Every structure is written in structure tokens, then in C-alpha cells.
Amino acid sequence: MRKKQGRLTIVKQTEVARDSYELVLEGELVKHMSQPGQFLHVRVDESEDLLLRRPISIANIDPEKEQVTMIYRAGGAGTKRLAAQRVGTEVDVLGPLGQGFPLEEAKRGEEVLLVGGGIGVPPLYYLGRRLVENGARVTSVLGFASQADVFYEQPFKQLGNVHIATADGSYGAPGFVTDVISQQSLDFDVLYSCGPTPMLKALTARYRERRAFISLEERMGCGVGACFACVCHVENGQAHEYRKICTDGPVFPVGEVVL
Amino acid sequence: MRKKQGRLTIVKQTEVARDSYELVLEGELVKHMSQPGQFLHVRVDESEDLLLRRPISIANIDPEKEQVTMIYRAGGAGTKRLAAQRVGTEVDVLGPLGQGFPLEEAKRGEEVLLVGGGIGVPPLYYLGRRLVENGARVTSVLGFASQADVFYEQPFKQLGNVHIATADGSYGAPGFVTDVISQQSLDFDVLYSCGPTPMLKALTARYRERRAFISLEERMGCGVGACFACVCHVENGQAHEYRKICTDGPVFPVGEVVL
Amino acid sequence: MERLQISLPGLEMKNPVMPASGCFGFGKEYGQFFDLNQLGAIAIKATTKEARFGNETPRVAETKAGMLNAIGLQNPGLQGVIEQELPRFDDYDVPILANIAGSTMDDYIEVAAELSQQRNVSAIELNISCPNVKQGGIAFGTVPEIAAELTKEVKAVSAVPVYVKLSPNVADIVAIAKAIEKAGADGLAMINTLLGMRIDAKTRRPVLANQYGGLSGAAIKPVALRMIHQVSQQVDIPIIGMGGIQTAEDVIEFLLAGASCIAVGTANFTDPYTCPNIIRDLPHWLDRLEVQSITDLIGGSWNE
Amino acid sequence: MERLQISLPGLEMKNPVMPASGCFGFGKEYGQFFDLNQLGAIAIKATTKEARFGNETPRVAETKAGMLNAIGLQNPGLQGVIEQELPRFDDYDVPILANIAGSTMDDYIEVAAELSQQRNVSAIELNISCPNVKQGGIAFGTVPEIAAELTKEVKAVSAVPVYVKLSPNVADIVAIAKAIEKAGADGLAMINTLLGMRIDAKTRRPVLANQYGGLSGAAIKPVALRMIHQVSQQVDIPIIGMGGIQTAEDVIEFLLAGASCIAVGTANFTDPYTCPNIIRDLPHWLDRLEVQSITDLIGGSWNE
Ligand SMILES: Cc1cc2nc3c(=O)[nH]c(=O)nc-3n(C[C@H](O)[C@H](O)[C@H](O)COP(=O)(O)OP(=O)(O)OC[C@H]3O[C@@H](n4cnc5c(N)ncnc54)[C@H](O)[C@@H]3O)c2cc1C
Ligand SMILES: Cc1cc2nc3c(=O)[nH]c(=O)nc-3n(C[C@H](O)[C@H](O)[C@H](O)COP(=O)(O)OP(=O)(O)OC[C@H]3O[C@@H](n4cnc5c(N)ncnc54)[C@H](O)[C@@H]3O)c2cc1C
Ligand SMILES: Cc1cc2nc3c(=O)[nH]c(=O)nc-3n(C[C@H](O)[C@H](O)[C@H](O)COP(=O)(O)O)c2cc1C
Ligand SMILES: Cc1cc2nc3c(=O)[nH]c(=O)nc-3n(C[C@H](O)[C@H](O)[C@H](O)COP(=O)(O)O)c2cc1C
Ligand code: FES
Ligand code: FES
């Protein structure tokens, strides 16, 4: 029986962009984490008014220090409460969960395009680090709503070229990540992406036949495959066919499931 | 409109006996507090699983520092959570509420007996301090379950004679406060008491015709007289007659209400 | 503040916020905390023909995100309310919704007839759903025909508009609401409390002296929203929505579900400033949702 | 561990704790967290005749101290369950309670007949109360006569004992329970979820794609306890109690109310170790209450 739950201690919590927090947790459970694109199912606190955990992606891992980093937007009740927690507090974490990005798809020397939108950017950072370790060549295209929302530009720069787009044009290129890809004529051997559904749809339309992998979001109950909350339809599948985002995903090859 | 709600800051929280905590709060609202026997209706924290406030008596006031002390037993869900809160945290407090002990009943030079049981002891401390200031002579009889539960013996000693009783005989006189009063033949001009109902019943049976005042407990909703949760019957009253413990009490002359 | 105004039968409200019956006494207590004239209306505690002590204590118990109450309709009786409680509202300019209850149809009729003639009573709230009254009460609220008959009788004698307060402890809330509308009710109030209980694991006994009590608070909000959503699509009379409202955002949810105004019950106990805080926050929500008036939101989850 | 044992029709349980249907899949997921043999029993996800996708997403929403779900009975269908899911329990020594659902009486009968003959199925849990199935389902659970007829038909074909799972969305739970007992049920399971909804104030739309969903979790515990307290005093068949159970203390409350064993639903999502933790803590509660066996507590709030 592999241990999948633990209490991790907050060692750092900082606002890295408007309402976006970088949370570093430390503890033994981190030993079990290594796959980029997997997520943690985080209990907000011990009080009993918010019963559901929050799924948040792994943004980085430091195996030596047994530390895991997440970056999340404090938008609703739960994440706001999480953001108010101080260093030293313990957080109840389930994970690592799900199927992450397939690292082995990008061979040494291949061109990889990381395409992230908003709060979908975090898992791409750890993915990029691992890909660079493996000898892939990484270009990142990161889209945000506006300048105040941009984070992690510098860390991504250490992995390779970075293009930033903002919807309101207040920073980087104006428009969406797909605009940047077109304008810069960016090409790739493998593409990995995480972000809002419209972005994933646009990428799917363009790259249905390519080696491309996307990470999806859905409201979750259990996070472990038991409750059937997080299913999606399969493209060209039978009416009752499905994939569970929590256990079959959150990462799928482009075109496998209906967005 | 008199201000009755405020956010006070925890300046001290210490365990003074088994599961019993002394909590000192500081803030502007303390200005409005002066009557011994009144209580504060305390919100446990900001989470929304425990909607009801907890009524806790004022145990001491330092008007200069704008500090109020409460002593409470961490028994149930709410008080346990309160006990876990650290110095610096703000606590949402409603109060002071209710009718406290009538100070003016004890004239200068009169003999006062304070009779407290368990977690009913705290309000008697501030009462005793005020009575001594007024020139009354104070004797305290304090009952606890056992030695581990005893608190505030020293502070009470500064007010006058103190007799401690423990139900299991592990400290002071074995037995109940009423046993001590009998054995020591303690007499008084005015008696003030707070503690468990059986104790209050025994005192009522003995001192129905005397100048005696007792403080009652009941489960509360609003704490301000609006919800009718905390009523009690009136002795020899009509069937529908009542007193509200939160606004008519918690202190009543002995014999006024049905215990 | 016109953006918050709403005009309902008998109730000209400055804003859609009133305290719920039984959670605000007869007004004076919370009048210590804020100016009652800020409120859209006030629903006062249930009045019965005779003075009642109600149930024995303990009468309230805490539950997760909720509470149980078994007050048992304690009140000073019709004459007591008329003589001691109502005159106090002379000093205020806020419509009063007088909640009435009884154990027999005759009781209801007598109380409605007399109370509705008092100055300071703007409308009647017919409580056919209090789960804590042993005789009568509960049955009125669960059988459409009886609820309709009672409504008709009370309407016949009432000098002011009549709102009927529904019990959520039913299988088909729409059937009851429609029967009551047909019987002539001017509006509905929903929901009253869900019947529940707590047991003390240590003493092995029910926590409430009355064993069962009414569950209120945030815990029941999803049930309230669902019932209002169902009923508002099937009736044409306005609904006073309630059940677990704590914030302006909650109010928006209720308006979108189909309520025309709302009442705040249990949340007053958690924070006595809940009503004024909601009134303060509502305009920000209107801005955010880019609507001019709260009336633009009523039923917005299904009528757009 | 004899103190925790309880023997019910078809279910020889080491302890009174089972995961609730729909909250534990078909077992394998939580099998990664602890040894399923620790459990008293396992209630598996509802099986319908054909494979079902269920409702569109979002299918869950959070509420204060609770959650809404509108899964819509997704499952691989009768043959899928028999071929893919049930064989996995060959490796375990724990009774399986197979929850079944359908939209017509014939569906139920067919599923019950075949599923009840499978090795690894110890008893049937007849779900007549799922609020998320549009046709049929809900009506079965709210009308005593229909509930009774369905029970009778399923009993007639089932090779194992039948527990009927009641809907709480009714005015008179006792009438339904008695009708079902009379129709031959071996036991009752209660409660299923309360029908509720959430509206997103920002988008102005219901949060769930299906609009309504079933409310579960701590929020509904008081309603569950009240219903079990009412029903257990009026029927002689055992009750599987559920609704918001999170701790061993909650379990004691349910036993005292009149349940013979309990199921844990939503709490598995908050903490996957809820069931084993409860099983670990129950003996301490027995010590504290000075009773030898959990059977000494059943109905203890009213039968002592
Ligand atoms: C696999 C996965 C990975 C994710 N990684 C990240 C990440 O790295 N950083 C980040 O900021 N966000 C991430 N999200 C989204 C994140 O889970 C939600 O933003 C968060 O749950 C919202 O909680 P709340 O308390 O702010 O909102 P509330 O409105 O209080 O949430 C109420 C309920 O809805 C759920 N919910 C609300 N929005 C979403 C959403 N977009 N996706 C899933 N559930 C939702 C919550 O989990 C909760 O159960 C991820 C989601 C998934 C499924
Ligand atoms: C006027 C007054 C003054 C009090 N002063 C003190 C004091 O100075 N120190 C102290 O330790 N205790 C005092 N109490 C008792 C104190 O209110 C309860 O111990 C406390 O509310 C229990 O909360 P909990 O979270 O521990 O228990 P829980 O079991 O979680 O409480 C659940 C609910 O029941 C209520 N409740 C439970 N026990 C009591 C009780 N004995 N009296 C009233 N309500 C109860 C709680 O307020 C809450 O609403 C006083 C009570 C009253 C009425
Ligand atoms: C302590 C208390 C007393 C109540 N008394 C009454 C009453 O007298 N008449 C009535 O119609 N409803 C009464 N109610 C029900 C409330 O008016 C309201 O319908 C219910 O509590 C749901 O709203 P909430 O969740 O905001 O409290 C009472 C509720 C509580 C908590
Ligand atoms: C996600 C989810 C799925 C459920 N699926 C089923 C089901 O398939 N069949 C059934 O009888 N009950 C189902 N239920 C109801 C539970 O079995 C249980 O009766 C209810 O959730 C109350 O218990 P709880 O508060 O512990 O969750 C489901 C509940 C949830 C939360
Ligand atoms: S969240 Fe429960 S199955 Fe995916
Ligand atoms: S607690 Fe509400 S009237 Fe006393």
C-alpha cells in the first residue's frame, strides 16, 4: 500500500502575482512525487464547512529538501483561506494523483513547446525542468489576463525562450498564446499545454494530428476515481464511454477526450 | 446606539488547570465593560461550521489596559478551537451582555460569601475584586472536581479567606461547597454564587429567604433576547411566565426562577 | 438607494432585506445594534391567540453550519403583542410582516382578523409550517388541500395582504405552493426549517428537550434555493426567500433562484450586523453584475 | 474486535462501518489507502441494466458543510459490473451490498435477479431514492404504495436479502418505511441525499449542469438522525444509517438514534481514512459509555 496522504508543513507562502500564491510545503510525502502534471488534492483546513479538497498541480519539486511547490489563484472561499495560512501550519495533502505529462514523448534534442494559460502555467514549470534535464529544447508561450497576473517569467527563461502574451496587451505580446504561436511561427516536435478550455480547444483544432498533450480541469469530489464527479466524454466514443480526469488524466493526448 | 460588538486581540492564552484556559483580550470594546457577572458572546472563529457564539463570563477587567479576562473550559468543539488560537489573533465578541451581580446589595463592612463551582468560579473573581474595593468583607468557597481542576486559588486569597473543596477529596476539603459551608459554619449578609445547577439548587433550598444571588446557564442562540432560546420558568408564576437568562439574567435573586 | 427598492403586496421595501420571523424578537433587541429603519421590512415573531411559554429547554442545539431550534412559538399572545410589542414600531418607518400561528383553524382566523387591523402591521405571514408545535401546525403545511383552505379562510378575514410560509418537509413543494396561490395568497415565504435532531453521545439522549427541532442556517441553503427555483417557475405571486442567508452573495443567489426579497434568520445570531452589512454590500454586487436594480435579477437563473 | 460485530440479514459484519454507495466506487480506489478487509461491509456504486454515462459536468458543487452531486448513476451496467467489478472482491473477505437502480420496475427486477445470484453479492440495496434520475426513480421513493410494490417484486426475485434505501425528500418517512417493511424488505438504508441546488452569483446559472443535485455531508446529519429516530421506533427491521457521518462519535449518535450499522459517504472524500479511523476509535467510545458491544447502543436514545 503506497502512502498517498500526509501532513506537510508550509515553509513558504508568497503572493507572486495578483491573487496568485506560491506555496511551498515540506514533508515526507514529497518522496513519492516525481511526475510533472500530477496534482495534489489539498484540504483547506480542519474546519468542517468546506468538506471538499482542492486539486492543485505540482509546480516544482525539490527532492533533497522534500519540498513541493504549488502556485494557485486565491479566487474562491477555499483558496482564499489557504492563502491566509502562515508558515509553520500543517496542510493535509492527498497525492500525488493522476497521470501527468508523458516525459518520454520528448526525446533528447527535440523541440518542445510549452503552452500555458493563467493558472495553467504552474505544472509546465516542473515539466520544463525535467524536459531540459532530459536534453529537450524548450520554448514557453505563457498567456495571462494582464501584466499584474504574470508570474514565473524568470524561472521559465532559465529553461529556454519565453514568449509572454497578455489579453489586454499590458505586457508582452497583446492577445492570446495562439496569436503568439502564429506570429512567431513557432513549431515543435512535442507540445504540452495546460490552461483554460477555450485555449485547449484552439490548440486541439490546430494540432489534432500532432504529438500534443493537454491537461484538463474539472470539479472533483474524491480525486482518486471513486465518485465519478470528474468524467469527460471520449471523442468518437460510445455514449457511455468516459475518462476520469482525476485518474485517467488530468493529462490526455490531444483529441482523446471531448472538451 | 451603544457599541456592543468588537474585535478584540488575544494578548494571553494559558492553561490554568486541566482543560481550563485563561484568555486575555484587548480592545476598545472593553471600555464598555464594568459589571461583574455579565458575559461575552464569543464567536469561535471565522469558519462557518460553528454558527453559534459561546457565552463566557467576564472574569476580570483591566480598564487601563483595555483588557478583559475570561476563564473557560475547553470541553466541546467550539471552546477547543478557541483554545487553539494564538496570541495576536482577533476574536469577535458581542457584549457585555446580561444583568450581572448587584454590587450595591453588599454594603461597606458587610460579610459576603462567594460560592463557586467549577467553571462557575470565574465571574466571582471580578465580583470579589469590586466588592473588596467597595469595602465588603469577602470569603470564597470554591468547589472543583479534583485537584487538577483547581484554578485562581491565589487571586481569590488576595480578596479574603478561601475554602477549596474537591469532589474526590484530592485537594482541600473533600465534598461539595455546601459541605464546607456547613462544616465551617460560614455565615454571610449577602451570598453570590455561580456553578452547576445541583449546587444552585442546594443553595436555593438553604437560603431562599436570604439576600442571595445566583448566576444561571442555558444554551443560547442570540444572547441578546431575540430568540427565546434561553428562558426559564418563574417560581409561582403563571404557566407562560418566563425570564430570559441572556437579558433578564444570567444573575437572579435566589428563588425568583425555577432551576 | 432606489436600486434596491422592491414593491410587494403590503410591503413597500427600501431594500429586499428583512430579518426572519423568530430570529429578531419584536425588533427591540437588535435595535440596540443598528437603526431598524435601514431594513426593508421586519418579520416579527409568531403570534398565537394565547400567550405561550413554548417548549422546555434546551431549545437550541448546534449542528455543522446550522442549528436546531424547538422554541415552540413562545410569545405573549395576541393581546400582549398588540399592547406591548406593536406600539414600539410607531417610531419606525419600516413595514412589519406579522407572523401568525395556531393549532386550530379558528385560532388562525381570530389572530389574523385582529392583528391585520393593527396599525403597524403591513402584511400577515401565515406560518403553516412550524415543526415544533405538536398539534395541528405540521399537517397544515404538508397537505395541499388543508393549506389552501386555511389560506382562503385567513384571506377572507385579513385586512392586509397574506404571505404563506411553506414547510420544506414535503415531497412536492410545487403542489402545495400552487394550491396556496389558487386559494388567494398574495405571496409565499420559503423556507421554514427542516425537521432534525441531535443526540448527545455521552448522555445518550436527544439534545433538545423536545427531541426534534427545526434545522436552519447555511446547512439548508441548497434545499431552500432548489425549492424557490422550482416554485417560482410555477407561480405568479412573489416569494420571500430564506434559509441560510449570510451574505450579499447569498442574496443574489436567492434572487436569481426566483425570490423577490429575502429574510435573514440564524445569521443574526452569528453576527447582529448581518442585515445592514448585506444592505451595504448589495449595490456592489449590482455593479459587478452590471444591472441597475435588484428587480433585474429576480428569477435570473431561469428566465433569461 | 467482537465488541464491534453485528449480524444483519445477509451481512455478517466485523464492525458496523461500511462506505456508502456511490462514494467508494467499486472499492479498488480506496484499496490503495487501506486494507478493505478492515471494513464491516462495502456498499458499491449503483448498478443499472445498461451502462450509463450519467449527467454532464459539473456534477458536484460544494455547500457549507456539505456537497451536492448529480452524478446521474454512472456505471458500467449489469454485465460490466458482473464481469469487471465484482470478481475483484474474490480477494477480500468482506460482505458486499450491491446498490441497484433503474427507471422502470422491470429494470429493477432484472438487475436484482441477476446481480443477487453473483458470488460476492451478500445483499441488495434497492435505491428507490436517487434524486438525479429524471424518469421514474424519484416517484418510487415518495409514494408508499409504489415503494411497497417495487420492494415486493424485487424480494420475489432476489437470491439475497434486500435493503431498501429511502429518500428523505418526503413528508412522512414513517409511512413509507412501514409500507416497505410490510412488503417484505429485510432492512432499510437511510438516508439518501436531500434535493438541493447552488447558483453561481457571477454567471447567474445553476452550478450543476443538471441544475439540482443531492445534498450530502455533515449538513444533513440532523435530518438523518431525526428520520432514523422516527422510523426505528416503528419498524422491526434493521436500519443502515447514514448522512454526514465523519467520526466515531457520529456513529454513536446514529446507533443511539436506532441504526444497526452505518455507512460513510461524503467523508471519504474529505479524508480517505475516515472508515478505518472510525473503526479504530469505536472501542474507546464503548469503554467511555461503559457498554460491552455496539449492539447495546442500538436505539439507546429511546429504548432505555
Ligand atoms: C487537475 C487540476 C489541477 C489544477 N491545478 C491548479 C493550479 O495549479 N493552480 C490553480 O490555481 N488552480 C488549479 N486548479 C484549479 C483549482 O482546483 C480551483 O481553482 C480551485 O479548486 C478553486 O477553489 P476555490 O476555493 O478557490 O473556489 P470555490 O468556488 O470555493 O470552490 C468550490 C468547489 O468548486 C471546485 N472548483 C472551483 N473551480 C474549479 C476549477 N477551476 N477546477 C476544479 N475545481 C474547481 C473547488 O475545488 C471546490 O470543490 C486545478 C484543477 C484541477 C482539476
Ligand atoms: C451566561 C453564561 C456564562 C458562562 N460562563 C462561562 C465561563 O465563564 N467559563 C466557561 O467555561 N463556561 C461558561 N459558560 C458555559 C459555556 O457557555 C459552555 O461551556 C460553552 O458554550 C460550551 O461550548 P463548547 O464549544 O465547549 O461545546 P459544544 O458542545 O460544542 O457546544 C454546542 C452548543 O451548546 C452550547 N452549550 C454547551 N454547553 C453549554 C453550557 N453549559 N451552557 C451554555 N451553553 C452551552 C454552546 O454554546 C454551543 O452553542 C457560561 C454559560 C452561560 C450561559
Ligand atoms: C430560533 C428560531 C425561531 C424561529 N421562529 C419562527 C417563528 O416563530 N415563525 C416562523 O415562521 N419561523 C420561525 N423560524 C424560522 C425562520 O424564520 C426561518 O424560516 C428559518 O430559520 C430559515 O432561515 P435561516 O436559515 O436564515 O435561519 C425560527 C427560526 C429560528 C432559528
Ligand atoms: C458522489 C455521490 C454519489 C452517490 N451515489 C449513490 C448511488 O449510486 N446510490 C445510492 O443509493 N446513493 C448514492 N449516494 C448517496 C450516499 O450513498 C449517501 O446516502 C448520502 O451521500 C448520505 O451520506 P453522506 O452524507 O455520508 O454522504 C451518493 C452520494 C454521493 C455524495
Ligand atoms: S474526482 Fe472522484 S472520480 Fe474523479
Ligand atoms: S439567547 Fe436568545 S433570547 Fe436568550
Curated annotation (Swiss-Prot), chains A, B:
This is Dihydroorotate dehydrogenase B (NAD(+)), electron transfer subunit. Responsible for channeling the electrons from the oxidation of dihydroorotate from the FMN redox center in the PyrD type B subunit to the ultimate electron acceptor NAD(+). The keyword Cytoplasm does not apply. One of its GO terms (biological process) is 'de novo' UMP biosynthetic process. Heterotetramer of 2 PyrK and 2 PyrD type B subunits. CDD domains: DHOD_e_trans. [2Fe-2S] cluster binds at C222, C227, C230, C246. Binds 1 [2Fe-2S] cluster per subunit. PROSITE patterns: FAD_FR. FAD binds at R54, P55, I56, S57, I71, Y72, R73, G78, T79. Belongs to the PyrK family. Keywords: 2Fe-2S, Electron transport, FAD, Flavoprotein, Iron, Iron-sulfur, Metal-binding, Pyrimidine biosynthesis, Transport. Gene3D superfamilies: Dihydroorotate dehydrogenase, electron transfer subunit (2.10.240.10), Nucleotide-binding domain of ferredoxin-NADP reductase (FNR) module (3.40.50.80), Translation factors (2.40.30.10). Its cofactor is [2Fe-2S] cluster; FAD. It comes from Shouchella clausii (strain KSM-K16). The keyword Iron applies.
From Swiss-Prot, chains C, D:
FMN binds at S21, K45, A46, N99, N127, K165, I191, G217, G243, G244, G265, T266. The active site is at C130. Keywords: Cytoplasm, Flavoprotein, FMN, NAD, Oxidoreductase, Pyrimidine biosynthesis. Pathway: Pyrimidine metabolism; UMP biosynthesis via de novo pathway; orotate from (S)-dihydroorotate (NAD(+) route): step 1/1. Its EC number is 1.3.1.14. Catalyzes the conversion of dihydroorotate to orotate with NAD(+) as electron acceptor. Its main location: cytoplasm. InterPro entries: Aldolase_TIM, DHO_dehydrogenase, DHOD_1B, Dihydroorotate_DH_1, Dihydroorotate_DH_1_2, Dihydroorotate_DH_cat, Dihydroorotate_DH_CS, Dihydroorotate_DH_I. One of its GO terms (cellular component) is cytoplasm. Substrate binds at K45, N69, A70, I71, G72, L73, N127, N192, T193. HAMAP family: DHO_dh_type1. This is Dihydroorotate dehydrogenase B (NAD(+)), catalytic subunit. Disulfide bonds: none annotated. Binds 1 FMN per subunit. Its cofactor is FMN. It comes from the Bacteria. Heterotetramer of 2 PyrK and 2 PyrD type B subunits. The keyword Flavoprotein applies. PROSITE patterns: DHODEHASE_1 (PS00911), DHODEHASE_2 (PS00912). GO terms for biological process: 'de novo' pyrimidine nucleobase biosynthetic process; 'de novo' UMP biosynthetic process. It is found in: Cytoplasm. One of its GO terms (molecular function) is dihydroorotate dehydrogenase (NAD+) activity. Pfam families: DHO_dh. It comes from Shouchella clausii (strain KSM-K16) (Alkalihalobacillus clausii). Coiled coil: none annotated.
